A protein has these predicted regions:
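N-terminal intrinsically disordered, cationic/polar leader segments
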Residues: 1-30, 40-113
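Short, conserved glycine- and acidic-residue-centered signature motifs
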Residues: 31-35
C-alpha cells in the first residue's frame, strides 16, 4: 500500500510518501502510475515555482518533500489528487492530511473543517 502524509512544519509543508501499490492487486499498477504522476508533477512545480524545496529519498519507495508557504497551493492540489485516488482504490493507497484538517466523507467528497 502507498501512504501519503501531508503535514505542516515550522517552515511550510511536508509530504511523506512511502510504500508500494501491490502489483498482485488489479489496481496496483494503475495506482502506482497515477500516484507517481501526481508526485512528480508536484516536485516539478515546486522546483520551478517555489522557494526552499527540499527532497529526501530515505529509501526506495520512501521520500519526503518539504516546501515553504508559497508551495501550499501545489501541495493542496497534490493532496486532493491523491485523496481522489484513495477514494477510488482504498485497498492500494491511503492519504492522511493534518496540514489542512481535511476529512473524507462517504459520499466521495472532500470536506474542509
Amino acid at each position: 500500500m502507498i501512504s501519503a502524509v501531508f503535514e505542516r512544519n515550522d517552515v511550510g509543508f511536508v509530504l511523506r510518501m512511502y510504500g508500494h501499490a501491490e502489483k498482485e492487486k488489479p489496481s496496483g499498477e494503475l495506482v502506482c502510475a497515477a500516484a507517481s504522476g501526481i508526485f512528480y508533477s508536484l516536485i516539478g512545480y515546486l522546483a520551478n515555482e517555489c522557494s526552499g524545496m527540499k527532497i529526501r529519498t530515505l529509501s526506495p519507495g520512501n521520500t519526503v518533500v518539504e516546501c515553504r508557504e508559497d508551495g501550499e497551493p501545489a501541495m493542496k492540489q497534490a493532496c486532493i489528487g491523491l485523496i481522489q485516488l484513495a477514494l477510488t482504490y482504498p485497498e492500494s493507497i491511503e492519504v492522511v492530511s493534518s496540514a489542512w484538517g481535511w476529512s473524507l466523507t462517504r459520499s466521495n467528497n472532500i470536506r474542509l473543517d
